[in-house]
């Protein structure tokens, strides 16, 4: 049944309305994320959320954030919801505050690691988890006018109020998470990416006594993620080495992920964080079934090294919501993604870059060793390369496996590697690219096969 009108916000957007991807609704602000779309998203999220009560909205530093928040607020209040706006904050602050305050849900306005011109909307339910697939589908159907909901009855307009002071609760949780551990005098560099981490990242480390150097430490929506942060580690590596720091941490735009470097500038990705933190929990007998949860992107060297420690690595599809679901189902204590999303059952089961950074730093010094020495105890990663092939046709990108030339090339490559490597090809859920990943024991094989498969994909998926 096609919906004729969505009073009080006007007609549905039809089939042109974008849907939820790997991490919410995301796209170019003003073109994909229009005020009209954000108004409708706010209204239908307000209707679809099951619990009664207010809804939280946080944002990163993007210039378009104020527009998106204003339109979402208009939609939510039109649905009768009170709205508490948090202002600039890390994404993990939203689910934490949902659970602490007992509100109906929350939204985070951010496009994470995407360029400044993009923006996005992440939606969380009453439990602080990302909105379920069935609820996302319900919102999408309402946006497109493919379904209808019962009338609300008498119109009630909600009230919006600024609530930036609530972020103090999140800051307190960061400090409480490390118990009595300290970082007094430890030289540390932070790359705050001009984004959400500027709201509390430096404060968290200073409160622990660290001797801090801060890069890109002010909110700047025109420079968020530009040649900095967790997707561009070179500035952090240079600063750590030049200043003789013990370690450094870089965050993405909304601070839900983190990558680290040691005092020698070596990169510590999410796989290494899981291995090192997981080893501590294993020794403390605080890791049920010796299980870690990661995604299909995690390195084969990580998996085999963890198995040698008697552990089990459970793999999920890409996306921290899949890691979250697997951890809940299995009772796992720790999980995450190679990209730096780390979820701890003891700390709210939400990817939190700042919390992960303070945990890694304080756990390291609680053992009386440097991060470099600790990294030496980690696994030896297999050479791995990821190439993004731009494919603008969404149908071809999503259904890439129908391309015989590409699947034949993959099969041939897999046969040549045997059990000593892996190939993963998938359509990105956040960008118009096909991701081609190859890992093997020999780096020359990785380079050759990645280049070959990317060329095949480029040739056969971008035909006129």
From Swiss-Prot:
InterPro entries: A-D-PHexomutase_a/b/a-I (IPR005844), A-D-PHexomutase_a/b/a-I/II/III (IPR016055), A-D-PHexomutase_a/b/a-II (IPR005845), A-D-PHexomutase_a/b/a-III (IPR005846), A-D-PHexomutase_C (IPR005843), A-D-PHexomutase_C_sf (IPR036900), A-D-PHexomutase_CS (IPR016066), Alpha-D-phosphohexomutase_SF (IPR005841). It is an enzyme of class 5 (isomerase). PROSITE patterns: PGM_PMM. Activated by phosphorylation. Binds 1 Mg(2+) ion per subunit. GO terms for molecular function: magnesium ion binding; phosphoglucosamine mutase activity; phosphomannomutase activity. It comes from the Bacteria. Keywords: Isomerase, Magnesium, Metal-binding, Phosphoprotein. GO terms for cellular component: cytosol. The keyword Metal-binding applies. HAMAP family: GlmM_B. NCBIfam families: glmM. Catalyzes the conversion of glucosamine-6-phosphate to glucosamine-1-phosphate. This is Phosphoglucosamine mutase. It comes from Synechococcus sp. (strain CC9605). The gene is glmM.
């Amino acid at each position: 049944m096609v919906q004729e009108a969505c009073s009080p916000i006007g007609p549905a957007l039809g089939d042109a309305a974008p849907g939820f991807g790997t991490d919410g609704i995301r796209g170019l602000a003003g073109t994909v994320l229009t005020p009209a779309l954000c108004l409708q998203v706010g209204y239908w999220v307000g209707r679809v959320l099951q619990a009664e009560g207010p809804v939280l909205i946080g944002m990163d530093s993007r210039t378009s954030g104020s527009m998106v928040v204003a339109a979402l607020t208009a939609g939510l209040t039109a649905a009768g919801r009170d709205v508490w706006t948090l202002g600039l904050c890390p994404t993990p602050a939203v689910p934490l505050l949902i659970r602490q305050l007992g509100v109906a849900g929350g939204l985070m306005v951010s496009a994470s690691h995407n360029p400044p011109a993009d923006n996005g909307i992440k939606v969380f339910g009453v439990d602080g988890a990302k909105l379920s697939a069935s609820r996302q589908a319900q919102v999408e159907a309402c946006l497109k006018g493919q379904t209808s909901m019962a009338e609300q009855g008498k119109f009630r307009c909600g009230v919006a109020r600024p609530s930036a002071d609530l972020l103090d609760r999140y800051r307190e949780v960061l400090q409480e998470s490390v118990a009595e551990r300290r970082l007094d005098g430890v030289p540390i560099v932070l790359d705050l990416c001009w984004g959400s981490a500027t709201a509390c990242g430096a404060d968290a480390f200073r409160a622990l006594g660290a001797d801090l150097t801060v890069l890109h430490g002010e909110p700047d929506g025109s420079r968020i993620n530009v040649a900095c942060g967790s997707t561009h580690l070179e500035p952090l590596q240079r600063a750590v080495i030049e200043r003789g720091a013990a370690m450094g941490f870089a965050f993405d735009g909304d601070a839900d992920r983190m990558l680290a470097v040691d005092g020698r500038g070596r990169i510590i990705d999410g796989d290494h964080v899981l291995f090192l933190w997981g080893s501590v929990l294993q020794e403390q007998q605080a890791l049920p079934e010796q299980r870690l949860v990661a995604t299909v992107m995690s390195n084969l060297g990580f998996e085999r090294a963890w198995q040698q420690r008697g552990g089990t690595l459970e793999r999920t599809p890409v996306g921290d919501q899949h890691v979250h679901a697997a951890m809940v189902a299995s009772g796992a204590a720790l999980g995450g993604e190679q990209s730096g999303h780390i979820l701890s059952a003891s700390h709210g089961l939400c990817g939190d870059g700042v919390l992960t950074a303070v945990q890694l730093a304080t756990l390291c010094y609680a053992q009386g060793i440097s991060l470099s020495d600790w990294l030496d105890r980690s696994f030896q990663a297999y050479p791995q390369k990821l190439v993004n092939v731009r494919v603008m046709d969404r149908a071809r990108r999503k259904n890439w496996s129908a391309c015989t030339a590409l699947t034949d090339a993959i099969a041939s490559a897999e046969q040549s590697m045997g059990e000593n490597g892996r190939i993963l090809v998938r359509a990105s859920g956040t960008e118009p690219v096909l991701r081609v990943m190859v890992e093997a024991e020999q780096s020359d094989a990785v380079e050759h096969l990645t280049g070959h498969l990317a060329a095949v994909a480029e040739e056969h998926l971008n035909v006129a």
